Amino acid sequence: MTYREVLENAKKSILNCKACPECNGLGCGNTLPGPGSKAPGNGAHDNWAAWKSIRLNFDTFVEDGPTDTSCTLFGREFSLPLLSGPIGSMTQYSKEDVTVAFNDGVMEGSAAAGTIDCFGDGLAPGVLPGALESIARHHAAAIPVFNPLPNASIMRNMDMFEDSDALAVCVVVDSAGLSHWKQSDFKPGAKTVADLQLLRAHTKKPFLVKGIMTAKGARQAVEAGADGIIVSNHGGRALADVPGTAEVLPEIVDAVKGKTTIIVDGGIRHGVDMVKALAIGADAVLICRPFAVAWFGGGAEGVKTYIELLKKEFSEAMYMVGARKVRDLNPEMLRFPGSGYKR
C-alpha cells in the first residue's frame, strides 16, 4: 500500500476532513466538531507554517555512512523518535464512534513499525478497557493520555494501566478550556503544580504532561516531577492566536533540556519537520491528525505505511544535514527566519 492509496481510500469514509495531501490546516479551518482549529481557525495552519519557516542546511562534508533513526525513550528502544497522537473521540471523523477500533489499529500499526502510540481517554465508557486489551494484544508501547478531570477521576483511570505494559501515563492540560468539555458533565479544569505532584505520586510509571507552551510552564512541569513534557497547543483547538510550537520550542529547550524528556507536536507532518524539531533540542515528536487519515485509509497497514514514509523522509534529511545518528542533530543544521547572511 502506498501513501497515495491511503489518502484516496480515506476520502471515501472520513467525515469533516478532506484527507488533504498536505495536512496544513487550510482545508479544515475552524471545522468543529471535526479536525479544525478554534475560531477563526488559524491555529493548525500557524503550527504548520512555523515549521516551514525553518530551513535545513546542507552538509555533506562528513564521514559517509548509513543513518540510524533509532532512539531510546523511557528506557526502551524504538525505530524512530515518533509518537502517534491521541484522539479522544472519533465521532468528529465518523458517524459512528469508532474510537476503540481506531486505537486498536493505530497501536497495531505503530507496534509493527516500532514506534509509540498515545491514545485518548475518550468520552465513551469502553475506550480505556478497549485500549488495555489492545496493548496486550499487540504488545504495543502505548501511553494513555488523560484529560484534566478531577484528580480522583484521573487516578481511577491511571489505576487501570498501572499493572499493564503501558509505556507511561500522561495528563493533558491544554484541553481544559475546550468548549465541548466545558459543556459536559466531566468537570474538566486547570491543574496546579500541586495537582500534578499528586498525580505524579500516584503512579510508578513515567509521568508526562501535555500542553506546555512556555519556559515557565516547562519548569513547573519539571517541579511537579514530570518525566516528560509535550510541547503542544492542542493543535490550535483550544485557543486562537497562540504561537506555533516551533516558535516556543527553543526557549523550552533552553529551560529544561536534560531535566525531562521533551516531545513536541503541532503541524509536524514530514520527516524534515522531525529533523528540525530534534535539531532544536526535542527528544521526539508527536503527530496526530494524519494518523486519523492513515487509519481511515488503510487501518493498521495504513498507519504503518505513513510511519514508514516518515522514517524514509527523516533518514534522508538526516543524511543531507550531516547527521548519522539522532543524537548528531543540532541547531547548526538549521537556518531560522531572519538569520540570513548580511554583509
Task: State the predicted function of each range.
Residues 51-58, 114, 162-165, 173, ...:
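Structural signal for hydrophobic packing residues in well-ordered secondary-structure cores
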Residues 36-40, 44, 99, 103, ...:
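Generic structural signal for well-ordered, non-membrane alpha-helical segments
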Residues 1-29, 217, 236-261, 269-343:
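Conserved active-site-proximal phosphate/metal-binding subdomains
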Residues 102-150:
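A gly/proline- and charged-residue-enriched helix-loop-helix capping module
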Residues 73-123:
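Active-site cofactor/substrate anionic-group-binding motifs, chiefly glycine-
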Residues 108, 137, 149-264, 271-294, ...:
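Alpha/beta enzyme core
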Residues 66-71, 129, 153-159:
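Short alpha-helical segments and helix-capping/turn motifs at coil-helix boundaries
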Residues 2-78, 338-343:
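An N-cap/entry alpha-helix motif that binds or orients negatively charged groups
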